[in-house]
């Protein structure tokens, strides 16, 4: 969303000490409270989205690990069976 996009006005309540800190940052950076709060909310939403996506990926990797273990176990069984068959055929049994 760009800065020129439509806006919605909101009323929020913040602790006085947080407002004082916000005003100090706004003064030092020569920016408005609105700009700083918008930036903070964007950063928060972005961080939450990143964290959510990482959690989804972690779960996906865990599910794939189980699937891969099953496939590996099946392949191991097939390899052992093939080895036994080859040994039997080579020995003439």
From Swiss-Prot:
Keyword rRNA-binding assigned: no
Effect of residue 68 to A: Still prevents EndoA toxicity upon coexpression in E.coli
UniProt family annotation: Belongs to the MazE/EndoAI family.
Name used for this protein in its record: Antitoxin EndoAI
Keywords for this protein: Toxin-antitoxin system
Stored CDD domains: RHH_NikR_HicB-like
A Gene Ontology biological process term: regulation of DNA-templated transcription
UniProt GO molecular function: identical protein binding
Assembly and oligomerization: Homodimer, forms a heterohexamer composed of alternating toxin and antitoxin homodimers which inhibits the toxin's endoribonuclease activity. Antitoxin prevents RNA binding to the endoribonuclease.
Biological role stated in the UniProt entry: Antitoxin component of a type II toxin-antitoxin (TA) system. Antitoxin that directly inhibits activity of EndoA in vitro. Upon expression in E.coli counteracts inhibitory effect of endoribonuclease EndoA. The EndoA-EndoAI complex does not seem to bind its own promoter.
One Pfam family of this chain: RHH_1
Plastid is among the record's keywords: no
Impact noted for substituting residue 79 to A: Still prevents EndoA toxicity upon coexpression in E.coli
Coiled coil: none
């Amino acid at each position: 969303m760009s800065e020129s996009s439509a806006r919605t006005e909101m009323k929020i309540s913040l602790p006085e000490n947080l407002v004082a800190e916000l005003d100090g940052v706004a003064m030092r950076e020569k920016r408005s409270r609105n700009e700083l709060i918008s930036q903070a909310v964007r950063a928060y939403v972005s961080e939450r989205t990143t964290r959510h996506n990482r959690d989804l990926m972690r779960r996906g990797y865990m599910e794939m690990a189980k699937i891969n273990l099953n496939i590996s176990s099946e392949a191991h069984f097939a390899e052992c069976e093939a080895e036994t068959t080859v040994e039997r055929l080579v020995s003439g049994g």
